[in-house]
Amino acid sequence: MACAHLCKEADIKTALEACKAADTFSFKTFFHTIGFASKSADDVKKAFKVIDQDASGFIEVEELKLFLQNFCPKARELTDAETKAFLKAGDADGDGMIGIDEFAVLVKQ
């Protein structure tokens, strides 16, 4: 639960329950439910660094697929369709990855 310290446990539980079934994940709903939209730029950067598991400076497809597990290790992987939609929404420059600035915009949507 690497990102759990940035959010309330009850909010994380609610957000994960809402997308428990395959193909029900909505990044907007998830970020809103866990309160990321109101987080400071520093907290958003901390979350980005956790999600960017290989410390490349970008969140790649495989890291997006495991996104929910950053909040609860037992959470499911995102489906290919969910991962593709998440990447499309966050990858403003079309390089196939989400950078820190793109992530900061994404969480505020």
Swiss-Prot record:
CDD domains: EFh_parvalbumin_beta
Pfam families in the cross-refs: EF-hand_7 (PF13499)
Keywords: Allergen, Calcium, Metal-binding, Muscle protein, Repeat
Keyword Calcium (UniProt): yes
Binding residue positions for Ca(2+) 1: D52, D54, S56, F58, E60, E63
GO molecular function: calcium ion binding
Metal-binding in keyword set: yes
Top-level taxon: Eukaryota
Binding locations of Ca(2+) 2: D91, D93, D95, M97, E102
EF-hand domain: residues covered: 39-74, 78-109
GO cellular component, one term: cytoplasm
Alphabetized InterPro entries for the sequence: EF-hand-dom_pair, EF_Hand_1_Ca_BS, EF_hand_dom, Parvalbumin
Known function: In muscle, parvalbumin is thought to be involved in relaxation after contraction. It binds two calcium ions.
Family: Belongs to the parvalbumin family.
Protein name, as recorded: Parvalbumin beta 1
